[in-house]
Amino acid sequence: PAQRPSWNYRKEDDGGIIVDMLCHWRYVLDNIFGSVKGVFCIGATHIAERIDENGKPYKCTADDAAYSIFELEGGIIAQFNSSWTTRVRRDDLLTLQVDGCKGSAVAGLRDCWTQHYGNTPKPVWNPDIPNPINFSEGWTKVPEQEDFDNAFKAQWELFLKHVVLDTPFPWNLMEGAKG
């Protein structure tokens, strides 16, 4: 069975991973790393036919993969590969890796790992022997400092407080349109 409803894979039904995901990457980047100045994205349909909810084949007309490069203020470049065709082989369904001069961080939906540049392995390219380095070693799990509630619930609570109590709510129509 498909991992998503069939309309997601049909352009004529407003489907496609580009319209679904790039807006999310926009607010993640804007709010954590810096304002987005530009974006380049190429979409692809890697699976041309799928099976719908009733077991019938249908033609996929929407993009099921997006390869994006974002230019942020401060000279930061961000790259996102979004796919409804890729099988997961990493720590989490979503991982964000940030690399800097003094180290790296990999954040998933729940956990974050860091590696200081002093702990970064220095592999030597030799395809004739098995790789002797376990690249997962040398990473340190960031300790949990507090418990976090469900993010969607927290967002709805902020919105409802805004509607009922007129509290500030920065995620207005203009912010949504940026995506």
Model-derived segments and spans:
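C-terminal glycine/acidic-rich active-site capping loop/insertion
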Residues: 48-54, 58-59, 67, 71-72, ...
